[in-house]
A protein has these predicted regions:
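C-terminal motif of bacterial Sec signal peptides marking the signal peptidase cleavage site
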Residues: 26-29
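Sec-dependent N-terminal signal peptides
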Residues: 7-22
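N-terminal Lys/Arg-rich, disordered targeting/topogenic segments
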Residues: 1-3
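Solvent-exposed loop and capping/linker segments of extracellular ligand-binding repeat ectodomains
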Residues: 31-37, 41-487
Length: 487
């Protein structure tokens, strides 16, 4: 599996300079300016705020119900009995049974687990070749080998249940249908094949289902720990994939790229690596569940060479260089996220175990309406939610102690904010230009409001912050509706 976060370790000083210039130009182009590095307590120069129109809060996007797809994979073959062994042709060996063909007339075929008291362990090459009327087939989980072209010409196939494994020397699904390369696989797998339930195995190989354009609903086995690079690339009809019940640890680069119909992706908490562009081109994605934001965790194993580069200052840890949502959608830098994130994305849920939301994590993720954070997150990084235009409310878990500079800067539709009981540190310009923000509740542990913290919050009417003893410059600049607080 190709693991591109490590490529970040090869960035030299020239590339770093280019990215710094890109960031500077991007910030200059924005309608307001995030805070520069400033020593806390210094007097900040006056910030001139432009006239900002409060946006229409209406958002009529509604998540699509995927229950039909879930039911389809869960109930597949549930009431269909196995065919009689007398209708199958097969060979019996000392180790098991190899099915070589079928002579019956069933259009929905469930192969039995055992024949003559021995497990069915293999499907021979060409075993069901040319069965153009076959609608569905279930291969028992005891099977460890399926020969090439076993289902070639099964052009009416709509549903299939089969173990995860590959033909010898052909690690791609299309080989079962006569393809001789993964690139050609999509042309051999029947477009009619829409439902696939995979069983057994621990790896979905690289390019395994490359361009299988008819697949709509797929269930991943509860034993799989790795999904390879480009595994479901260009599966343009893939709408639903059941994956959150697995012990998955790694998803390769562009594993689901080009899955233009995919509605949601819910990964398990066990994942420690997510490849570059994993969801690039998933233009209809509405919700996602991830264990962290970025390409990998800080405990992701590095080579000695990579460790030396980090210690020598020639590189940063890939968990830091990839710690933004746009990385998963193909953006090479966090400032490019807006051009890659699907406009359909409404909800992001971060799973328990995540301890921090990195700087720039959701930078200009303008379409997102809701981000669910788990108890255990301790810090919201700098610019973490900068420019999240459709974020309407935020309630932090009690574990959060710090909010970085510009963390919610420019969240123009956010109306309410509530800090958890553990919050004590607010960054400068943390809520600047949140023009729709009406109500803010901060715990008594917050004792200082830093420079420009609420500047430009035109709608702010209620601020509950009884622990505040000091405040910086221009904290409430243009907060004309707020009463009881001094500029």
């Amino acid at each position: 599996m190709k693991k591109h976060p490590k490529a970040a370790l090869r960035f030299g000083s020239a590339v770093a300079a280019m990215l710094a210039l890109t960031l500077l130009l991007s910030m200059t182009a924005c309608f307001d300016t995030p805070v520069e590095d400033t020593t806390e307590g210094e007097t900040q120069e006056a910030v001139t705020l432009p006239t900002i129109t409060i946006p229409d809060p209406t958002d009529d996007r509604a998540p699509t119900d995927t229950a039909e797809y879930a039911e389809r994979v869960e109930s597949l073959f549930a009431t269909i009995p196995p065919v009689s062994a007398s209708d199958l042709t097969y060979e019996v060996t000392e180790d098991g049974v190899t099915v070589t063909g079928y002579a019956g007339g069933e259009l929905i075929l469930v192969i039995p687990d055992t024949i003559e008291d021995k497990p069915v362990t293999a499907i021979a090459e060409n075993a069901f070749k040319g069965m153009g009327n076959l609608k569905a087939i279930s291969v028992p989980h005891s099977v460890t080998t399926i020969g090439k072209s076993a289902f070639e010409g099964c052009v009416s196939l709509t549903s299939m249940r089969t173990p995860v494994f590959t033909c010898e020397d052909a690690p791609y699904f299309g080989a079962l249908f006569g393809a001789t390369s993964h690139e050609a696989g999509g042309g051999y797998v029947p477009v009619s094949l829409s439902t696939l339930v995979l069983t057994g195995g621990d790896t979905i190989p690289d390019y395994a289902f490359y361009a299988c354009r008819g697949l709509e609903a797929v269930s991943i086995p509860e034993t799989v720990t790795e999904i390879g690079a480009f595994a479901f690339y260009a599966c343009q009809s893939l709408t639903y994939i059941a994956i959150d019940h697995t012990p998955l640890t790694a998803v390769g680069e562009r594993a689901f790229a080009g899955c233009a119909a995919l509605l949601n992706l819910h990964l398990p908490v066990t994942v420690t690596y997510m490849g570059s562009g994993m969801l690039e081109g998933c233009g209809k994605l509405e919700s996602m569940t991830i264990p962290f934001v970025g390409g990998c965790t800080y405990d992701y194993p590095l080579t000695e060479e990579e460790k030396d580069a980090i210690e020598g200052g020639d590189a940063v840890h890939p968990a830091e260089s990839t710690g933004y949502l746009g990385y998963l959608f193909g953006a090479s830098h966090y400032t490019f996220t807006a051009g890659y994130l699907p406009a359909s994305l409404i909800t992001v849920t971060v799973l328990e175990g995540c301890e921090s939301i990195p700087a720039n994590a959701f930078f200009e993720c303008a379409s997102i309406r809701e981000v669910n954070l788990p108890e255990g997150v301790m810090e919201i990084g700098r610019r973490a939610f900068y420019g999240c235009d459709y974020l309407t409310a935020m309630t932090l878990p009690d574990s959060v102690t710090k909010i970085g500079d510009d963390a919610f800067h420019g969240c123009i539709r956010m109306q309410t904010f509530a800090g958890g009981a553990g919050l004590s540190d607010l960054g400068m310009q943390a809520f600047m230009n949140c023009v729709s923000l009406e109500t803010v509740t901060l715990p008594d542990s917050v004792t200082k409001l830093p420079n420009s913290c609420f500047a430009g919050c035109l709608s702010l009417t209620t601020l509950t912050a009884e622990g505040v003893k000091t405040q910086g410059d221009r904290v409430f600049h243009k907060c004309d509706k707020l009463r009881g607080w001094e500029e």
